């Protein structure tokens, strides 16, 4: 089973992707994580990608498509995976379908712009285990101590400022809304209310995927 999580930045795709992937024992592949890993390398590709990220612009299709194809074909995912953040537009979707023949389920996270901004501005994660927190909605139970691993080192994303976030959301709308219309006619497109709390969203996704 291949499941695609669609939604704007801050919609909760990463949080739910990790949660659902663990429950059904499938890999969670997040395009954002892949590119952040590339950016940490000292290569011309990393510098090019980082320039787009800093300006709040989407990385060009030809770069995204090739990175994703190379990544997916370099591993054997016999039982499928959860793909988070790709495809983001119609061209990427058609490219994806050109080399992936398995049946796909698409889940779209519908969230208001105001809530998205708060989620992104407040977001940070444990450097050790990757657990995601939020200054507004989800703090560790003990100040500066990760609930999962006990680490006291956290990572705050440098590209998360309000001006860049608003631009990313607008760019996302322009790029991705035609893709939503495209998938609506596939028979495998589902919408979840991303404004609900984490547990409620997880339950909605489990119903769609028919898992307990």
UniProtKB/Swiss-Prot annotation:
Q: Which residues bind Zn(2+)?
A: 126, 129, 146, 149
What GO terms in the biological process aspect are recorded for it? AMP salvage
Molecular function GO terms recorded: adenylate kinase activity; ATP binding; zinc ion binding
Q: Does the keyword Zinc apply?
A: yes
Q: Which domain of life is it from?
A: Bacteria
Keywords, A to Z, come to: ATP-binding, Cytoplasm, Kinase, Metal-binding, Nucleotide biosynthesis, Nucleotide-binding, Transferase, Zinc
What Gene3D superfamilies does this protein's entry cite?
A: P-loop containing nucleotide triphosphate hydrolases
Q: Is this entry keyworded Nucleotide-binding?
A: yes
Q: Which residues form the signal peptide?
A: none
Instruction: Give the main location.
Output: cytoplasm
Localization per record? Cytoplasm
Residues the record lists as binding AMP: 36, 57-59, 85-88, 92, 157, 168
Which region ranges are annotated with the description NMP? Answer: 30-59
Reactions listed under catalytic activity? AMP + ATP = 2 ADP
- Spans annotated as LID: 122-160
Residues noted as binding ATP in the record, renumbered to the chain: 10-15, 123, 132-133, 196
What are its E.C. numbers? 2.7.4.3
**What is its pathway?**
Purine metabolism; AMP biosynthesis via salvage pathway; AMP from ADP: step 1/1
Instruction: Provide the Gene Ontology terms for cellular component.
Output: cytoplasm
| Comment text on domains | Consists of three domains, a large central CORE domain and two small peripheral domains, NMPbind and LID, which undergo movements during catalysis. The LID domain closes over the site of phosphoryl transfer upon ATP binding. Assembling and dissambling the active center during each catalytic cycle provides an effective means to prevent ATP hydrolysis. Some bacteria have evolved a zinc-coordinating structure that stabilizes the LID domain.
Similarity-based family: Belongs to the adenylate kinase family.
The annotated subunit structure for this chain is: Monomer.
Job description of the protein: Catalyzes the reversible transfer of the terminal phosphate group between ATP and AMP. Plays an important role in cellular energy homeostasis and in adenine nucleotide metabolism.
Under which name does UniProt file this protein? Adenylate kinase
State the taxonomy lineage: Bacteria, Pseudomonadati, Pseudomonadota, Alphaproteobacteria, Rickettsiales
């Amino acid at each position: 089973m291949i499941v695609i999580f669609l939604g704007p930045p801050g919609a909760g795709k990463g949080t739910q992707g990790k949660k659902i992937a663990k429950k059904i024992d499938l890999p969670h592949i997040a395009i954002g994580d892949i590119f952040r890993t590339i950016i940490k390398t000292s290569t011309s590709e990393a510098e090019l990608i980082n320039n787009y990220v800093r300006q709040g612009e989407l990385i060009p299709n030809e770069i995204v498509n090739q990175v994703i194809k190379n990544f997916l074909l370099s591993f054997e995912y016999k039982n499928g995976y959860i793909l988070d953040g790709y495809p983001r537009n119609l061209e990427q979707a058609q490219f994806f379908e050109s080399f992936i023949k398995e049946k796909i389920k698409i889940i779209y996270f519908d969230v208001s712009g105001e809530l998205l901004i708060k989620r992104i501005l407040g977001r940070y994660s444990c450097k050790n285990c990757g657990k995601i927190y939020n200054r507004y909605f989800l703090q560790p139970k003990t100040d500066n101590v990760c609930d999962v691993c006990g680490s006291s080192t956290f990572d705050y994303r440098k590209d998360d400022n309000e001006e860049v976030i608003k631009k990313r959301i607008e760019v996302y709308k322009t790029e991705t809304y035609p893709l939503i219309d495209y998938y609506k006619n596939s028979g495998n497109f589902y919408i979840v209310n991303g404004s609900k709390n984490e547990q409620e969203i997880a339950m909605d996704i489990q119903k769609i995927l028919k898992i307990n």
